[in-house]
Amino acid sequence: MDRKNDSLRLMDGAGYKKIIIACDSYKGCLTSREVNEAIASGLKEWNAEDASSEIITLEMSDGGEGMLDAFLSAMKGERVRIHAHDALMRWIEAEYGIVDDTAIIEIAQTAGLALIEPEQRNPMKATSWGVGEKMMNAYRRGVRDVLVGFARSATSESGQGGLTAM
């Protein structure tokens, strides 16, 4: 007996029809898209003889790295690139998204831990100022609703820097 085909029949008499892959990133290693593509590639190889299966990949995020990409991938929004300050007030290229009338802002891209070397991390100096700069940029474009992902922030000031920047 072929175990692989038996397991497929257990799930659905005709084999899998639709497979949804929705993984978060592997922090510091692979993005959500890369994880999903690796799994999809493995499934296609494993199930090569069943061309009727449809594999759907959805980018996911816990609100940290990859949140903006996940939203823009799923909702077909606009990516906006600006200059803003990181958590140590250094100028960086930053981006946020606009989906319909809502700005999608990922703190990890502006004031995130990954942007600061471990020896430079200092919660007493880190600020979310650049997040406020993104919000103001979106406001000037007519956006009035904002969704912010707070995971992986290098700050501990509860958004005070961002509010001050606005």
Language-model features, listed with the residues they occupy:
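N-terminal loops that bind phosphate or other acidic moieties
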Residues: R3-F150, A154-M166
